[in-house]
Amino acid sequence: MSLLNVPAGKDLPEDIYVVIEIPANADPIKYEIDKESGALFVDRFMSTAMFYPCNYGYINHTLSLDGDPVDVLVPTPYPLQPGSVIRCRPVGVLKMTDEAGEDAKLVAVPHSKLSKEYDHIKDVNDLPELLKAQIAHFFEHYKDLEKGKWVKVEGWENAEAAKAEIVASFERAKNK
């Protein structure tokens, strides 16, 4: 089955499927799944010696304001393989702006059927403060050595904001 056929979720916006592009703690290589072919491409080698603090992927059949599917960070006890799909629950969103405009990153935790470890996390404020700081620090600095690129982290928003972003981006993609 092609990743292109993976639905956005089981019960939007509460129960989503995230297609993983970059595993947590991986080498500083940005991978992207081509949305037309489903192939995993090397997008670029990151200039900074940093790694993604969480698994990084997207929700199929969504369209964020930056023109791409909605980006999602997924903390897990182990790194996930690129191209894998994980069932999740959205808990928050990191609002940012970069050189191209608005760029939000959702945070979602594994669904209870996969692990009970995250059942107590209902909102981004339930995540460990250190993890939130690592995520914000990563995105504030991962483009530092790339000429003409920058990121400004604006802050965290709650689970309801994340769910609203999912619904809006799903509708945006449907109406495109």
Swiss-Prot record:
Known EC number: 3.6.1.1
Q: What gene is it encoded by? A: ppa
Q: Which cofactor does it need?
A: Mg(2+)
Taxonomy of the source species: Bacteria, Pseudomonadati, Pseudomonadota, Gammaproteobacteria, Enterobacterales
Cited function: Catalyzes the hydrolysis of inorganic pyrophosphate (PPi) forming two phosphate ions.
**Family that this chain belongs to:** Belongs to the PPase family.
Q: What is this protein called?
A: Inorganic pyrophosphatase
> What species is given as this protein's source?
Escherichia coli (strain K12)
Residues that hold Mg(2+) 1 according to the record = D66, D71, D103
Q: How does it assemble?
A: Homohexamer.
Chain sites annotated for binding substrate: K30, R44, Y56, Y142
Record keywords: Cytoplasm, Hydrolase, Magnesium, Metal-binding
